[in-house]
From Swiss-Prot:
Record's subunit section: Monomer.
GO MF term (any one): amine N-methyltransferase activity
Family named by the database record: Belongs to the class I-like SAM-binding methyltransferase superfamily. NNMT/PNMT/TEMT family.
Main localisation: cytoplasm
Membrane-spanning segments: none
Keywords from the named record: Cytoplasm, Detoxification, Methyltransferase, S-adenosyl-L-methionine, Transferase
Organism: Pongo abelii (Sumatran orangutan)
Protein name: Indolethylamine N-methyltransferase
Length: 263
C-alpha cells in the first residue's frame, strides 16, 4: 500500500470500530469467508479452553479491538480476564457492550454459536452475563512497549491471548519478534500464549481505509514464538482466508505455546 506503514496514530484517528465489525463480524447466517474465519477461531478456542483444556486464574487478551468473541470460551475456565486495545474508540466499544449501554454491538448470533459448540445452545444470555462478570478491566495496550499494558502493572498471567492483531501492529518481522517477547513478559513461567495469525497479509480494509500488516509465513511465526521463549504445544495451519477485497491473506496459523520455566 502507498504512504508507508499505518502506525498507532493512524489507528487512533481513522480506525472506526463499526466499519470493522460490519465487515468482519456480521455473522447474520449468510455464508461468507469472514463468517467462516470467525467460526474457525471460535472452534479453535473452544477446543483450547473447553473441558480438559487450558485453565487458570488470569487471562490477558492483547489487541482485543472492539470484539468479545475471542474470550467466550475462556470465560468458562479463567476467573479474571483483561481486555486491551491501543485505540480509545475500540476500548469504548468494549465498555459499551460490557455495561449494556444503548447502541452496543449485538453479539447475540456469535454468542449463540459459541454456546452451540459447548452444547448449551439455549444458555446464550447466561453466557453473556458470565463473560461480563469475568472481564475485570479494559486497558490500553501497546505491544511495542516492554510492558504492553503500561502504565498499568498486572501480576504475571496464566494465559495471554492475541488474535489477528500482532501482524497488524508490526511493520516488520523484527518488530513482530520483539513484540512477542514483550507479550511473553506478561506471562508466568509455564503460562500459555494462544494466538491466531493471518499469513501473507500485507493490508486489510476497514470501510474505505486501508491498514497495513507485516506479511508473515508460517515458518516465520513458528520461529518467532520459539525465539520468544516458548515451547509450541499445538500449531494448526489452515487455508481459511478472508474475502480478497477485504483482506487478501493466504491462510491462517493457530498456535498454543507454553512459556519455558525461568532459570
Amino acid at each position: 500500500m502507498e504512504g508507508g506503514f499505518t502506525g498507532g496514530d493512524e489507528y487512533q484517528k481513522h480506525f472506526l470500530p463499526r466499519d470493522y465489525l460490519a465487515t468482519y463480524y456480521s455473522f447474520d447466517g449468510s455464508p461468507s469467508p469472514e463468517a467462516e474465519m470467525l467460526k474457525f477461531n471460535l472452534e479453535c478456542l473452544h477446543k483450547t479452553f473447553g473441558p480438559g483444556g487450558l485453565q487458570g486464574d488470569t487471562l490477558i487478551d492483547i489487541g482485543s479491538g472492539p470484539t468479545i468473541y475471542q474470550v467466550l470460551a475462556a470465560c468458562e475456565s479463567f476467573q479474571d480476564i483483561t481486555l486491551s486495545d491501543f485505540t480509545d474508540r475500540n476500548r469504548e466499544e468494549l465498555e459499551k457492550w460490557l455495561k449494556k449501554e444503548p447502541g452496543a454491538y449485538d453479539w447475540t448470533p456469535v454468542v449463540k454459536f459459541a454456546c452451540e459448540l459447548e452444547g448449551n445452545s439455549g444458555q446464550w444470555e447466561e453466557k453473556e452475563e458470565k463473560l461480563r462478570a469475568t472481564v475485570k478491566r479494559v486497558l490500553k495496550c501497546d505491544v511495542h512497549l516492554g510492558n504492553p499494558l503500561a502504565p498499568a502493572v498486572l501480576p504475571p498471567a496464566d494465559c495471554v491471548l492475541t488474535l489477528l492483531a500482532m501482524e497488524c501492529a508490526c511493520c516488520s518481522l523484527d518488530a513482530y519478534c520483539a513484540a512477542l517477547c514483550n507479550l511473553a513478559s506478561l506471562l508466568k513461567p509455564g503460562g500459555h500464549l494462544v494466538t491466531t495469525v493471518t499469513l501473507r497479509l500485507s493490508s486489510y480494509m476497514v470501510g474505505k481505509r486501508e491498514f497495513s500488516c507485516v506479511a508473515l509465513e508460517k515458518e516465520e511465526v513458528e520461529q518467532a514464538v520459539l525465539d520468544a521463549g516458548f515451547d509450541i504445544e499445538q500449531l494448526l495451519q489452515s487455508p481459511q482466508s478472508y474475502s480478497v477485497t477485504n483482506a487478501a491473506n493466504n491462510g491462517v496459523c493457530f498456535i498454543v505455546a507454553r512459556k519455558k520455566p525461568g532459570p
